[in-house]
Amino acid sequence: MTFRIDCLQYANWSEKIFRQMREGGVDAVHVTIAYHENFRETVLNIEAWNRRFELFPDLIFQGRTGDDVRRAKETGRTAIFFGFQNPSPIEDDIGLVEIVHTLGARFMQLSYNNQSLLATGCYEAEDAGITRMG
């Protein structure tokens, strides 16, 4: 079985886009739900996605495992996987990793463009690499 997966996407999400994904045969999408948001702001983004899942259950659902990609293909829907471009949602609390995973996050970059608590970003003049927390 072959799958079509969009490995990273950020858009002005709407029913029109969800229908276009289905027309294009997209089985799964890694959706950016945090660039530089803190934990609370990220939870608000997840809340907005939960409303979309309720409004468009015939088009999308929250993906959590590889089996969800298969289920999406079999049911003619798109599995939405949450990801962060930077670890800002975990703030300075490593325990929040488990919490955001429970809420559905499946991808988290150690850094985006700037220095994070975990690693150096590509825009930094000095590359210090992974931090002690990272």
Predicted region positions:
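N-terminal hydrophobic targeting/anchoring segments and the immediately downstream early-domain regions
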Residues: 1-128
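Loop-centered beta-sheet repeat module
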Residues: 130-134
